[in-house]
Every structure is written in C-alpha cells, then in structure tokens.
Amino acid sequence: DYPHIKAHLDQFIDIFTSDNKPYGLHRSRKEKFFQGEKIISLRKCVERPCFSYSDFDCYVTQTFFSIKTTRWNMKFLTGVLNSKLVAFWLRHKGKMQGSNYQVDKEPLQGIPLPLIDLSLQQPIIDLVDAILTKKKQSPQADILDLENTIDYHVYNLYGLSDNEIKIVEGV
C-alpha cells in the first residue's frame, strides 16, 4: 500500500476520463485465463516458438500469451504447438519480427489443428508427460529424443511424406 501516492493521484479524480485509475491495472484480463490448466507462451520467441503446459494458477504479464480450450487435450495441444511442423507453419503463415516469432491469437487460431479422437492424441500426451517428468526432476534434462518423437507423431497426424518432412526440417 502506498497511501500518499494514492491520495496525491485522487486529487485529480475529476480530470480522469475513464474508469482506469492511474494506479489501477491497464487492460486487466479476466482471472479465468490465469487459473487451472493452460498453455503459456512468450509473445516474442527467438529461434522457435515455445509453449509451456501449466496445470496450476499462475499470473503472467501481457508479455505472455495464455491458451485455454476444451476442444483438445491441453497436453496434446502443447506437444503439437511445440512441434517443428507448427514452427514451420508459423514462420510462413504467422507474424515474424526479423527471425523472431510473434505469437498472437490470429496466427494461432489459423493453425489447421486436427480434431481427432483422444486415443489418437494419447501417444503425444504420454510424451509430453514424460518431458514434464524429466524437466521436473532436472530442469537441464535432455529431452531432444522425446521432442523428435513428438515431431514424428505430428508428421503422421498430418500425413506428411518424407520429402515434406525434409522441407519442414530444412534438410
């Protein structure tokens, strides 16, 4: 609490033209976006987009983007969004600032995500669980093999040929 600052600013209450007080939140967001299961990403990502799964309440600034949906399992969606295929798609169809990805709502909503049965999502869900377990045990753990296996499953979901996979991977 800063009662002197608030008292000073309250002197100008008649001048304010909006409900946003100078000591209040600017463009506050609904609390539901911070609670429960969600995917969080930095709005500006270097090298490739990075999406993190969270199953606890956490409050982040607007430099982060929060995703909540009931159409897909959130761990499945985390795996797909972190895939090389989605990075390739965002590089060509999303917003870029130089070589940095800008993760925004519109490009993400444009990703043609497959609506598939939970049983087909399960291999990716299991791999994301394995990554979360390894990272919880050791934040520096090498998860490259698990990420490559997720990429393989994502390529299969979209029916990519070997030549298309080479294009995505820049080979």
What do the predicted segments below correspond to?
Residues 1-120:
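Polybasic, glycine- and aromatic-enriched phosphate-binding surface used to engage nucleic acids
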Residues 4-12, 114-171:
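Non-catalytic DNA-recognition/assembly elements of restriction-modification systems
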